[in-house]
Amino acid sequence: MRFFVFTCLLAVALAKNGIEQRSASEEIVSFYQEKYKQDSNAAIYPTNQETPSVSSSEESVEVQTEKDEQIEEENVYLKQLKRIKQIFQKFYIPQYPEVYQQQIVMNPWKHVKTTTYPVPIPETTRIPLEEIVKKIVEMIKFNQLHQFVIPQYVQALQQRIAMNPWHHVTPFRSFPVLNF
């Protein structure tokens, strides 16, 4: 009982400590993020005091141009990815190094002569998903038809005790038993 109470108190204390550390670390992170934003704004953009006020329509135009630029960059990036994908689809790159079949020929002078012949790698063929599904269905039907059924007569047989010829039980005793 004491151990249970102790573990509960310890868990509560650790949870409070973790929450306090998280809140402190979150405050530090937010402070540095604000400081970074202020530094980056000061370095790149002048502060609001230095620039005259800009109307809301001009700000919305700037925001839209920035969004358009981001969309264009994303489109260019996607086009480049598509080109790279098309280039790699043209080339067949094997996943494993080529296997060479070695033939060993014994010379009469007890020297081993080895020759290597490249094993032809067949081109990969793509099988449609429908054919794969058909094959799976056929295999399931085949397995259902040819299931091995245990015959019922095997279960009905009684177990017999194996007899040992050295411990043969005789119906008659070799010595008389006296009952008083």
From Swiss-Prot:
Protein name: Alpha-S2-casein-like A
Keywords: Milk protein, Phosphoprotein, Secreted, Signal
Single GO MF descriptor: protein homodimerization activity
Organism: Oryctolagus cuniculus
Role summary: Important role in the capacity of milk to transport calcium phosphate.
Annotated disulfide bonds: none
Subcellular location: Secreted
Signal sequence region: 1-15
An example Gene Ontology CC term for this record: extracellular space
